């Protein structure tokens, strides 16, 4: 994914204002029109009782990546609906969410995301998701 420095800097600035994203350790890795990659390191306090990444954080990563991907095309958005498919236990040293805009519109944007667990043996797809976002005119 090619980085566009101004776009990447803008998204990182927005990300810095989101307290939840900062608490999780979410970073914007790369951005271009319609595509964003974010990452979050594993910490034990992000896990559920079996030691896997909590499904709530899986959803948060997918929602966040999709939202940022939509922002690169239409500006300010708010999530209307999202769905998550957990494919396997999310175990890794780092989690990478890659989102893309599927269909932009004047009032809504459809996005899709894949979430990978990264560890010493590479990346494994752990979840997929889709988000429907509403365009926030004038913001």
What is the predicted function of each stretch?
Residues 1-37:
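Non-catalytic linker/capping segments at the edges of enzyme domains
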Residues 2-3, 89-92, 96, 102-139:
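HotDog/MaoC-like acyl-thioester-processing domains
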Residues 16, 41-63:
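Hot-dog-fold acyl-thioester-processing enzymes
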Residues 22-24, 34-36, 76-82, 93, ...:
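A generic structural signal for short beta-strands and their flanking turns/coil linkers
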Residues 30-32, 42, 74, 91, ...:
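Short loop/turn positions at the edges of beta-strands in beta-sheet-rich folds
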Residues 34-41, 99:
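Short, aliphatic-rich beta-strand segments
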Residues 40-42, 86, 135:
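Hydrophobic residues in beta-strands and at strand termini
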Residues 67-96, 101:
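Hydrophobic beta-strand-centered segment that forms part of the acyl-chain substrate-binding groove
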């Amino acid at each position: 994914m090619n980085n566009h420095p101004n776009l990447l800097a803008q998204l990182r600035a927005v990300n810095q204002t989101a307290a939840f994203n900062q608490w999780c350790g979410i970073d914007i890795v790369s951005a271009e029109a319609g595509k964003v990659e974010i990452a979050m390191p594993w910490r034990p306090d992000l896990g559920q009782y079996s030691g896997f990444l909590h499904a709530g954080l899986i959803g948060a990563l997918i929602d966040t990546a999709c939202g940022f991907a939509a922002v690169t095309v239409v500006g300010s958005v708010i999530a209307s609906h999202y769905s998550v498919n957990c494919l396997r236990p999310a175990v890794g040293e780092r989690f990478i969410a890659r989102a893309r805009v599927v269909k932009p519109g004047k009032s809504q944007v459809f996005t899709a995301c894949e979430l990978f667990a990264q560890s010493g043996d590479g990346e494994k797809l752990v979840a997929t998701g889709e988000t429907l976002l509403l365009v926030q005119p004038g913001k």
